[in-house]
Amino acid sequence: MANYTAADIKALRERTGAGMMDVKKALDEADGNAEKALELIRIKGLKGATKREGRSTAEGLVAATVENGVGVMVEVNCETDFVAKSGPFIEFANKALAAAVASGAADVDALLAAEVDGKPLSELVIEAGALLGEKVAIRRLARVTGAVVDAYLHKTSKDLPAQVGVLFAVDGEGEAATTAAHDVAVHIAAYTPNYLLREDVPADLVDSERRIADETARAEGKPEAALPKIVEGRLTGFFKENVLLDQPFAKDQKQSVAQVLDAASAKAVGFARFRVGA
């Protein structure tokens, strides 16, 4: 008869994020000793690291923080939502975020090379995968700097950690700038802009949109004399959809994001938006 309880299984699953059958097998082999079972799960996980390498990691979380005018955000992935909400995975993601802040890493490769607890973070990624029994990966890293930086994390499900993260930075000061930065960060989470300014949109993309607008208007039989105005109007619509400062503000559609920031004497200087798996 097994010398462990359902509570022991639950506790070890919470510690490791491992599946129920894996936990039961480890407890059986360890004669009910939780610490020995934990070691067995880790050993089994390390042996399976090569097999996990090709697996898809579409779940996970976004973690972000702001320190001294610098916002840092990471997306950390795993295979299942069960692991994504587990304590060990969340702990590892927070450790990766702390390493990103401390190291000043500019990209994921630099972050993986950063030393944490006396070893490169890349080794901790492997160890986390071994413990959790799933492939774990740091997908991307963002860093945004400004006088005021807001980090906004959004849960798409109450049972999961944040799936959407935003960093938004402005040059400005005072409560008005801080409030505007936060409100726009929330807006970015919902409205998914691709660019900060019109000038950031690649010229070839603008040319393509202008050409499509012209050809569409001609196909609709619009008068030749009206084409320039129609094309510019449709191009404006493209900018409103894709450029942050041109977008109608989420909390007040009568204002653009640019107008909201102007009213707060704040100038947008950068943003980043992550959604897990997107």
From Swiss-Prot:
<dbReference type="GO" id="GO:0003746">
    <property type="term" value="F:translation elongation factor activity"/>
</dbReference>
<dbReference type="InterPro" id="IPR001816">
    <property type="entry name" value="Transl_elong_EFTs/EF1B"/>
</dbReference>
<keyword id="KW-0648">Protein biosynthesis</keyword>
<feature type="region of interest" description="Involved in Mg(2+) ion dislocation from EF-Tu">
    <location>
        <begin position="80"/>
        <end position="83"/>
    </location>
</feature>
<dbReference type="InterPro" id="IPR018101">
    <property type="entry name" value="Transl_elong_Ts_CS"/>
</dbReference>
<dbReference type="Pfam" id="PF00889">
    <property type="entry name" value="EF_TS"/>
</dbReference>
<dbReference type="InterPro" id="IPR014039">
    <property type="entry name" value="Transl_elong_EFTs/EF1B_dimer"/>
</dbReference>
<dbReference type="GO" id="GO:0005737">
    <property type="term" value="C:cytoplasm"/>
</dbReference>
<comment type="similarity">
    <text>Belongs to the EF-Ts family.</text>
</comment>
<dbReference type="InterPro" id="IPR009060">
    <property type="entry name" value="UBA-like_sf"/>
</dbReference>
<protein>
    <recommendedName>
        <fullName>Elongation factor Ts</fullName>
    </recommendedName>
</protein>
<comment type="function">
    <text>Associates with the EF-Tu.GDP complex and induces the exchange of GDP to GTP. It remains bound to the aminoacyl-tRNA.EF-Tu.GTP complex up to the GTP hydrolysis stage on the ribosome.</text>
</comment>
<keyword id="KW-0963">Cytoplasm</keyword>
<dbReference type="InterPro" id="IPR036402">
    <property type="entry name" value="EF-Ts_dimer_sf"/>
</dbReference>
<keyword id="KW-0251">Elongation factor</keyword>
